[in-house]
Amino acid sequence: MKLNKVHNIDFLNNDLPDKCANLIIADPPYYKTKGDFDFIWKTFEDYLLDVEKWCLECKRLLSDNGTLFWYGGSKNIAYAQIIFDKHFYLLNNLTWNKGSFMGLEESEILRSFAPCTERILMYSNETYNLTQCIFMIRDYIRAEIIKAKGKIVLKQVNEALGTATNGGGVASACLSLDKTEPTMLTKEMYQKLQSWCKPYLTKEYEELRKEYEELRRPFKNKFNLQEVLNFSNEQAKTGAKYDHDTVKPETLTRALILTCSRENDLVIVPFSGSGTECAMSAKEKRNFIGYEITEKHAKMSQERANKILKEPTLF
């Protein structure tokens, strides 16, 4: 699996292993909206058949704690959502507000309101959630207590923690098997359990916390974004530069990548187009693998990313 490469092949013909993608950013053809690639299907039903194929391939590739972004036009995104909702868990139906659109908001020529938005569906794998991360930590602690004490008596655990002396309280919240959402122990409480369970429960709290964080789906909202994403459409400036009809803004793409992935994560780009997603992945120290059926766009995407990859760093 060669990283940081744009393949000039159909995304459906990839040879990637299952669950390899930490983040998928897919900007597919919207169907009869803009660009030659939007008009290759005879009917909308034919287009939706391909959407289903793309969806299933994304499902195969997305890791258990990964995130998928799926772009679409405001008129047709509902049809894609019906398909994706069958296979993923919908986190957000995001609206990308592009701002002023060719001054049409001041004109009545369209006989309707000016189109200034696109949609981005945000999905996770419905089979994996935060609770499962806590279950793994809880099960480790339970196993170590059993090694040390032979069995788990919640009252004794509470006494060791210096909390309630009955069978409920903190011990029940953190360790009981019948809790649908167990609570994470604080560092102070965990260290008390370590002293009580010597020579077992040897993992340090910071090690457990790091494991917990790495198991969670990445989401750090450093840009304070909400469901409406206000990013100007840079296409007027970048479209001609990259010779593509649907160039996505670098600012928006960077925000999605930084919010929903970690450094060295793998970003899969099923439709690399002008190369924005690949280039911004490289810029933010993520690995990427892109796919593009048009040769000139595949070459352009690779060159755009390579320019960033070859930039000297301070360290």
Task: Name what the model sees in each region.
Residues 1-291, 296-298:
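Core catalytic lobe of class I
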Residues 301-302:
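Conserved SAM-binding loop
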Residues 307-315:
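Positively charged, low-complexity nucleic-acid-binding target-recognition regions
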